[in-house]
Amino acid sequence: MIKRLIVISILLIVGTVLCGCMEQENVGQQNSEAQEKIVLKIFHAGSLSVPFEEYEKMFEKEHPNVDVEREPAGSVACVRKIIDLGKKADILASADYSLIPQMMMPKYADWYVMFARNEIVLAYTDKSKYKDEINSTNWYKILQRPDVKIGFSNPNDDPCGYRTQMVLQLAELYYKDPTIYDNLVLKHSNIKVEENNGTYLILVPKELDVDTNKLFVRSKETDLLAPLEAGAFDYLFIYKSVANQHHLKYIELPKEINLGYYEYADTYKKVALKIIAKNKTINAKPIVYGMTVPTNAPHKKEAIEFVKFVLGHPEVLENNGQPAIIPAVAYGNVPEELKDLVKIEK
């Protein structure tokens, strides 16, 4: 009897040890699998957050060995992370394609693709003052009322912010009223404007200083959504796609000033903006998104595959209010894997 108990005890101990070894082996395999997963890092414009979240889920489903990590910010800030802070990203997607050739090429990028369009609208909520009175013809008069507070993103950090300045300066030309931009921004900030033979250069200082009683400013446009919905300010200049994605009410601005139409490119270019901190001058132009794989991207193969995936599924952009450019237009040393999906310009 005693011998049987001893044998049983030994068997139980051996079994426990074996189970523990098997569990450790399984955990080790799981950890190994997790470690083998490729982390694809994407720096992208805040206005691409909704469609890129969809792309992330779709891409990961088809590529289970890839973990897509997105880091949204103002497009200028995204670029600076790479060229100034030395951070590495597998993909850079900007709300202004021109930032890639102007700031990244040739050292940090040698090609880019223009893949989607947008336009600026004036968004508001049920809490906004004069919401029942404002329309597409009197909006600029409503905004000038003393008790109305407007919001836009920082022109130093975000294309939506500097495009807002361009839109308001263009509004002066369109409505033939030289006081619009002055009353809405210049009198309430340290932004300046220089006029030369019918063209205008907006000067944005390194440190933006605004009258917070009139202007509400944050780094990128998506940072302004929650405060707008909470009633912290009344009206927000933002991309039409973002307004649609967040179910905001909005006023459509005239085509001649909303930066959304190629046929008005000559009108838009009457205005330019200089970011003094970077000594960069940006001409107003139709809003076009750009994307590239930086030259120092850690996972170029997977990054190019993601770009190819985006270009192959334009319906995601279309469904989120950002018309896709079909075929996408590409410049530079375009990867072979993308050449069948793009129109290459010299």
From Swiss-Prot:
Tungstate binds at residues 46-47, 75, 158-160, 221, 239. One of its GO terms (biological process) is molybdate ion transport. Keywords: Cell membrane, Membrane, Metal-binding, Molybdenum, Signal, Transport. It comes from the Archaea. Residues 1-19 form the signal peptide. GO terms for molecular function: metal ion binding; molybdate ion binding; tungstate binding. PROSITE patterns: PROKAR_LIPOPROTEIN. It is found in: Cell membrane. Molybdate binds at residues 46-47, 75, 158-160, 221, 239. The keyword Signal applies. One of its GO terms (cellular component) is plasma membrane. The keyword Zinc does not apply. It is a peripheral membrane protein. Part of the ABC transporter complex WtpABC involved in molybdate/tungstate import. Binds tungstate and molybdate. The complex is composed of two ATP-binding proteins (WtpC), two transmembrane proteins (WtpB) and a solute-binding protein (WtpA). Belongs to the bacterial solute-binding protein 1 family. WtpA subfamily. This is Molybdate/tungstate-binding protein WtpA. The gene is wtpA.
